[in-house]
Amino acid sequence: MTDIEKQTEIREKKGRNVMRELKIQKLCLNICVGESGDRLTRAAKVLEQLTGQTPVFSKARYTVRTFGIRRNEKIAVHCTVRGPKAEEILEKGLKVKEYELYKENFSDTGNFGFGVQEHIDLGIKYDPGIGIYGMDFYVVLNRNGVRVSKRRRAPGRIGPSHRVDKEETIKWFQQKYDGIILPPKPKTKKNVYRRR
């Protein structure tokens, strides 16, 4: 290797700043059943099969008579996955969506989410005792150095240039997964009643 080749290699390494690279902090999976009981425990089994972790039950915040939900009643189940397992499950979920997401799926803080209609599309074998459930995927992205704002002792602030925004997340999604951003959904007109 000549000196010129070494220098160009060093420049390339410096050009890729490790602190600026986006990474998946966590993947949150959520199944909202809307009622407690047998259906909820079966939904918990689905999440346990998918993640290999014991999921957590979510309670209703307040009573909604029309839905038949009481306050503090367990109505949903969710699970947080991190590391390589999160990337693996996200890959399965995006494969179901054919790597196509809408711009509305991405938030201003650099996170994105989408839904899957049937859990059997993710590669889980169909069990008639469990049934079919849909689920929500929420992906939280961040950069190295976020701990500065989260730590207990001497917390600092992250500058605006280091925060993750919508455009960066979309670019990351397109580069990493060869994702396609679909045009916005056509807005349906709601029934407009005019006074006579």
Swiss-Prot record:
Keywords: Cytoplasm, Nucleus, Ribonucleoprotein, Ribosomal protein, RNA-binding, rRNA-binding. Disruption phenotype: RNAi-mediated knockdown results in sterility and a germ cell proliferation defect. The keyword rRNA-binding applies. InterPro entries: Ribosomal_uL5, Ribosomal_uL5_C, Ribosomal_uL5_CS, Ribosomal_uL5_dom_sf, Ribosomal_uL5_N. The keyword RNA-binding applies. Gene3D superfamilies: 3.30.1440.10. SUPFAM superfamilies: RL5-like. GO terms for cellular component: cytosolic large ribosomal subunit; nucleus. One of its GO terms (biological process) is translation. It is found in: Nucleus; Cytoplasm. One of its GO terms (molecular function) is RNA binding. Pfam families: Ribosomal_L5 (PF00281), Ribosomal_L5_C (PF00673). Its main location: nucleus. Belongs to the universal ribosomal protein uL5 family. Component of the ribosome, a large ribonucleoprotein complex responsible for the synthesis of proteins in the cell. The small ribosomal subunit (SSU) binds messenger RNAs (mRNAs) and translates the encoded message by selecting cognate aminoacyl-transfer RNA (tRNA) molecules. The large subunit (LSU) contains the ribosomal catalytic site termed the peptidyl transferase center (PTC), which catalyzes the formation of peptide bonds, thereby polymerizing the amino acids delivered by tRNAs into a polypeptide chain. Component of the large ribosomal subunit. There's a functional difference between the two L11-encoding proteins in C.briggsae. rpl-11.1 plays a role in the germline whereas rpl-11.2 has a somatic function. This is Large ribosomal subunit protein uL5A. It comes from Caenorhabditis briggsae. The gene is rpl-11.1.
